Amino acid sequence: MKLAVIVFPGSNCDADLLWAVKEVMGIDAEFVRHDATSLAKFDGVLLPGGFSYGDYLRCGAIARFSPIINEVIRFATEGKMVFGTCNGFQILTEIGLLPGTLLRNDSLRFICKSVPLKVNTHTKFTSEYPENVSIHLPVAHGEGNYYCDEKTLKELKEKNQIVFTYQEKVNGSLANIAGICNEQGNVLGMMPHPERAMEELLGSTDGRSFFASIIKNFGKELSQ
């Protein structure tokens, strides 16, 4: 299994993401620039956090026009794994791979802290977490307030697409949503950073089971 970590102008969590999957989890991975046009040698895509293109207009609005995005969309439509954290989540909503949008935090302040999360373990991204587990992951964002219309929220609930839920008030997100997946289950976006919770020295290892789930479920599909 080989993963691509996409690097946009303004990305600042790309190194964290590469370190987490490659050095800690032992997954083959490498950086891919935003202006690349092929992901032919990769099996999955990771969109990192940061401030792509300075977050001008709105978060992810300019990144959606990067040449690599066409390949990311192709990956998703072919059922391959696509994951976006923080700014990566914002980009996934901008390009239409995930429903809804991310608004300014209701406090109008940047939030940087560890938050408790409820995990839906019945997804390919979370199957290695114990049932009914509560985990802690860092967040660091100014625009993480998830919003969608009532019809979309109803569908997210009915189709088991809400993957991570805040267990306390964090940013005003509708239904306390912290992360969602697409209906097919191969695309996930979340505001918290699992790549920053990989070592006890950093305060938590709760992110490891997230990447272990990716290895088990998406890696298994490649070997079949």
Swiss-Prot record:
CDD domains: GATase1_FGAR_AT
Catalytic activity: N(2)-formyl-N(1)-(5-phospho-beta-D-ribosyl)glycinamide + L-glutamine + ATP + H2O = 2-formamido-N(1)-(5-O-phospho-beta-D-ribosyl)acetamidine + L-glutamate + ADP + phosphate + H(+); L-glutamine + H2O = L-glutamate + NH4(+)
InterPro entries given in the database record: Class_I_gatase-like, PRibForGlyAmidine_synth_PurQ
Annotated metabolic or biological route of this protein: Purine metabolism; IMP biosynthesis via de novo pathway; 5-amino-1-(5-phospho-D-ribosyl)imidazole from N(2)-formyl-N(1)-(5-phospho-D-ribosyl)glycinamide: step 1/2
SMART domains: GATase_5
One of the protein's GO biological processes: 'de novo' IMP biosynthetic process
The Glutamine amidotransferase type-1 domain, residue ranges: 3-224
Location relative to the cell: Cytoplasm
Keywords, alphabetical: ATP-binding, Cytoplasm, Glutamine amidotransferase, Hydrolase, Ligase, Nucleotide-binding, Purine biosynthesis
Domain of life: Bacteria
Active-site residues, as the UniProt record annotates them: C86 (nucleophile), H193, E195
Molecular functions (GO terms): ATP binding; glutaminase activity; phosphoribosylformylglycinamidine synthase activity
Enzyme Commission identifier(s): 6.3.5.3, 3.5.1.2
Gene3D superfamilies the UniProt entry points to: 3.40.50.880
GO cellular component, one term: cytoplasm
Functional note: Part of the phosphoribosylformylglycinamidine synthase complex involved in the purines biosynthetic pathway. Catalyzes the ATP-dependent conversion of formylglycinamide ribonucleotide (FGAR) and glutamine to yield formylglycinamidine ribonucleotide (FGAM) and glutamate. The FGAM synthase complex is composed of three subunits. PurQ produces an ammonia molecule by converting glutamine to glutamate. PurL transfers the ammonia molecule to FGAR to form FGAM in an ATP-dependent manner.
PANTHER family the record matches: PHOSPHORIBOSYLFORMYLGLYCINAMIDINE SYNTHASE SUBUNIT PURQ
Quaternary context: Part of the FGAM synthase complex composed of 1 PurL, 1 PurQ and 2 PurS subunits.
Protein name in the entry: Phosphoribosylformylglycinamidine synthase subunit PurQ
Organism this protein belongs to: Enterococcus faecalis (strain ATCC 700802 / V583)
